[in-house]
Amino acid sequence: DYDGTIRYSWTLDQLAAATELPAGPEHDGLVFQEWNWSLENLKATNRKMNVGATYTTDDGTTRVYIHLQEGRTSPMMGLGVNGTVTVDWGDGTTPDTLTGTSVSTTVWTPTHEYAAPGDYVIRLTVDGTMGFVGTSTSNQYSCILRYSSSTDARNTVYRNAVRKIEIGNGVTSIGASAFQACYTLAYITMPKSLTSIGSYTFNGCFLLASITIPDSVTSIGNSAFTSCYTLASITIPDSVTSISGYAFYFCNTLASITIPDSVTSIGSSTFQNCNTLASITIPDSVTSIGSSAFNGCYTLAYITISDSVTSIGDSAFKACNTLASITIPDSVTSIGSSAFNGCYTLAYITMPKSLTSIGNYAFQNCYPLASITIPDSVTSIGASAFQACNTLASITIPDSVTSIGSSAFQNCYSIRYFDFTNHTAVPTLSNTNAFTGIPADCEIRVPAALYDEWIAATNWSTYASQIVAV
């Protein structure tokens, strides 16, 4: 439900047998519209999925619940209006009327003077269409409730007066920064008339614990839920095709999320620093995982990457400290820089045969990684790619590898040998520190026919005493 309450829970067998979805929840003042997934699409997906209820208000008005402090009783409101919006301030005074021609252009009410602090419900009646609007400028942000239409530190007090929003008829968009820095906004219901959620929309809504996105929404904007520290539940419908960068950045309480099959890309830093995210399945529709997408997801222990993914971005899984194993599908051709850097418990990884490059720092500080097979499609090993893989015992470098970056195997303290015996040419060694810190008895095994050339080659000569002809 919109407040995070689990109303029903089905197994996949129960889903397969179902002929209709359950009845919607009932709430005073709200009218259930629909679940944000259809039964048909749930059955087609046939995997774990969170489903949420969408509502409109029983009288069609949009309600903004506020709590005003002593000495802070003079707010104004900015809205995007295409037509007219009547603003009933909830204190028995004469309503204000706003007129406009665009849901993305802000129209301001006059300053309203409340007679006393306390709790009020502002009701917005829309004739036409309306959007919520904001700006990313410091000391402005959301226009939902402010002291001034321009920059003023007192705007923060009024934004923080907003506690709950129930969206009614006529609202089609929640624009960029629409509720940004509404620190005490704890609940919101959104109807199926909504078509877009803009960038920074809920950025910094610290108390927002749960949200249901209607199935009319197709995209989640950049940083839309950044720093929603208590957001524990979100239901994404299969109408959403893209989740932009930083969308859930620093959502520290988000323990699980289901990505629908409609999503084709996961943007940069989308789930970065979601510290309690424990597992995630990336659907077949996703073709790319952006840089730092799961960086700092310390409790991420399980992830399934579909065979539609072709690239894993820089730092994509960096510092996923609980990730013990991962299989990279054959569709992936590149692993970005620092992709798995600092995955301290990563002991097993399967690399695809399609892989052509291993980026800089890709597996740096993967301390328990004991073995790895580099496919013969790889042509380059980046700088510090396996630096400080302290448990790595041996590795075979295929003939396809033509260059090895600086510090690539530095401080691999347990390694017994490097196998280059299938090489037909000496690969380029970028720096003399490529093997710094390996044990004194570690062998660099090379073909006997190339031995003399190998020990004389640039930077390889540093390790002449450890190069062994086989």
Residue ranges and their predicted role:
Residues Y8-Q14, N41, V121-D127, Y158-S173, ...:
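Structural signature of tandem-repeat unit edges
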Residues D1-D58, V126, Y141, L145:
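Secondary-structure capping and domain/repeat boundary segments
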Residues G175-Q180, G198-F206, G221-T226, S244-Y249, ...:
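Consensus positions within tandem repeat domains that build extended binding/scaffold surfaces
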Residues E26-V31, L79-V85:
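Short proline/glycine-enriched turn/loop motifs at strand-loop junctions of beta-rich domains
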Residues W10-D13, P95-S104:
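Solvent-exposed serine/threonine-rich low-complexity stretches and specific carbohydrate-binding patches
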Residues D1, F32-W35, A53, V87, ...:
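Extracellular/surface recognition and adhesion modules
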Residues T56-G80, D127-I167:
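Extracellular ectodomain segments of secreted/surface proteins
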Residues S102-A116, Y120:
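Residue-level recognition of secondary-structure-to-loop junctions
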